[in-house]
């Protein structure tokens, strides 16, 4: 979407006090007169065919887990949010399998963060993720390990294997 606000300023009246420089400039150029004329354009390829509409509110938690692997990021985010809101812990084993064995790295990442949202990431799982080929997962696993280091600083030795990781995201998180 592209938004053409068709307006000189974005500020609301509360942010533009009378007597201020910006207030005088807005009045001088008439920027406050041009309101309610904005447009929103939806930009899409001429051959774009929309997919099926989601009906996630009517789906089971197990069905929502499948959406964590969806190619569309909105579907992944929405499924993750609904899973956590529901608090259905019966799907934790399925999430662990997706986090470690899923084909799509983004699906694995969403499964991992969903497990973390349930406070169900442990050192065993995270050490498996440290060897994942995708650097986003390795960096996320490091981040999830940090609270566990507060519990027992000896766990820091697990991170030594990542000290030479060539990817900058992993190095920065470490």
Each language-model region and where it sits:
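Beta-propeller domains with acidic blade repeats across secreted/periplasmic ectodomains
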Residues: 1-63, 74, 84-85, 155
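Alpha-solenoid HEAT/ARM repeat scaffold
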Residues: 76-77, 106-109, 139-140, 157, ...
